[in-house]
Amino acid sequence: MKTAGLLLLVTGIISLSGCALFKRARVHEHNAIESREFNLPIFLYPAKKPQTRKLLIFLSGDGGWIKFEDDLSVKFAENNFFTIGINSRDYFWDQKTPEQTAHDLVQLIRKYALRYKTDQVYLLGYSFGADVLPFIYNQLPLRAKRHVMALEMLSPFSTTDFMVHFGDLANISSDNYPYKVDLEVKKLKIPVFCFYGLDENEKALETIVQKNFVIGSLYGDHHYKDSEYDKIISVLKQKP
């Protein structure tokens, strides 16, 4: 009976794999300028006021570049952040390493910091994008780190693997990957703002206690209410 049930589950998943949910290129309608640079699938949102000094790099969840990422990026741009989104689903569809990702990202930062004449960089990640964020920052060269003002992690899990897994997309995998997010966060010295939805079942990093780590809550579950976007933005607007 168990074998038959497992076979039915596998058959169902295989049949679902043909739908958009399980395809690499998952991008919804958006308001960005879409491009690919330094191996990174990016989405550009110019700041409302060009004279701003703030540059935001936003790593999406493994669901792709969809409505949440687009809506939040638009709001950041309206609040005078030059915003560059990265489609984590596309980029991490193939296995990466923290070193490789940091190498690609620092080239992107250098190019757009020069183009936009910004010297204040902020790193934001949602879900899978939040999981990999501390590893990437810790691999940046010292010169690049000096310009990163803060990290913001939205609904991170406890482990990650620098690759999108089918089981995660199907919501059938366990949070047991080789890269331990909490241990990497503890190495960080710059301000880190972490948020979870009030109704999320697991808040993997809620037990971390260190001076530079601030944890907060947002209305909603793993998908927040639209009214909470201002709260996400406000913590970075205050730094420095």
Model-derived regions: residue spans:
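C-terminal motif of bacterial Sec signal peptides marking the signal peptidase cleavage site
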Residues: S17-G18
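Conserved acidic catalytic loop of the alpha/beta-hydrolase fold
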Residues: D104-D119
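C-terminal catalytic histidine-bearing segment of alpha/beta-hydrolase fold enzymes
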Residues: V214-P240
